[in-house]
């Protein structure tokens, strides 16, 4: 698995747009692409999915969460490890781990866990590595 990640603290510099277009370009070249939207604004998910798909995905009454929050839920609730990774098929070679506006609630878990890793607390390591392991799980599907 080769990984390409974009990071910049400044917003509005084109990270999401660049990633969206690179995903399509690599897919056109025959590469299998997994796009993970771990930005709490979920703009990348909004670019890939239609309005009706987004409404279904983020419907609070939808019992089956199909966003990144589904595998994170057990970690957030302190009930164990990550759950199954939901994937949306965008095109034959593109899969998406959909973002969620509620992902911002996980940021506090990450900051708390970071310090606890220094004390070698196993749940903290599960928390800090969860997003990476969600990507690995999705890539294996």
Question: Where in this protein do the model-derived segments appear?
Answer:
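P-loop NTP-binding core
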Residues: 1-141
């Amino acid at each position: 698995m080769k990984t390409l990640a974009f990071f910049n603290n400044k917003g509005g510099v084109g990270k999401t747009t660049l990633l969206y277009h690179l995903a399509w370009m690599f897919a056109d070249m025959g590469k299998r692409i997994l796009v993970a939207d771990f930005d709490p604004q979920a703009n990348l998910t909004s670019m890939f999915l239609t309005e009706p798909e987004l409404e279904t995905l983020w419907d609070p009454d939808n019992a089956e969460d199909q966003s990144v929050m589904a595998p994170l839920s057990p970690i957030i609730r302190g009930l164990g490890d990550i759950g199954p990774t939901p994937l949306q098929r965008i095109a034959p070679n593109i899969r998406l781990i959909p973002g969620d506006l509620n992902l911002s609630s996980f940021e506090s878990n990450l900051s708390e866990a970071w310090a606890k890793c220094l004390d070698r607390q196993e749940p903290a390591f599960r928390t800090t590595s969860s997003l990476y392991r969600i990507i690995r799980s999705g890539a294996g599907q």
